[in-house]
């Protein structure tokens, strides 16, 4: 990954292992144990996530449910277990402002055009790299 883009610097983002740029913005102070997880997890977590034109979020799986929320830039092509949806501002033409990826389901994403895309992702139970795998 190259030099940190200006928006990533402004938002204090770092490279993400799946591609793109991220910064954790919130981690619930509430923690609990739940079946299928090794140890306690925060009730939920949130990140800002930035993809530039030509970048992608590589196919990966997160154990928990993940809510994607579109903020700005161009549309985002989100692949959820082979089905593609588009997040973006043009709701009149079928773009969505948010989408949920169920836990344990493969996902990938990329800008649908030639603009950057800024989204947030909220994960519950909270994200832990122990629950993440590249597919």
Q: PLM features: what roles do these ranges have?
A:
Residues 1-99, 108-109, 114-116, 121-134:
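Non-catalytic, conserved peripheral segments adjacent to functional cores
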């Amino acid at each position: 990954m190259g030099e940190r883009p200006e928006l990533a610097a402004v938002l204090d983002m770092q490279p993400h292992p799946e591609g793109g740029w991220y910064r954790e913005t919130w981690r619930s102070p509430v923690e609990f144990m739940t079946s299928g997880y090794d140890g306690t997890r925060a009730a939920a977590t949130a990140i800002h996530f930035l993809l530039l034109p030509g970048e992608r979020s590589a196919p990966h799986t997160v154990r928990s449910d993940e809510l994607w929320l579109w903020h700005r830039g161009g549309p985002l092509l989100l692949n959820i277990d082979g089905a593609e949806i588009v997040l973006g501002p043009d709701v009149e033409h079928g773009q969505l402002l948010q989408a949920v990826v169920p836990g344990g389901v493969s996902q990938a994403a990329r800008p649908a055009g030639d603009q950057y895309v800024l989204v947030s992702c909220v994960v519950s139970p909270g994200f832990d790299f122990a629950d993440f795998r590249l597919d």
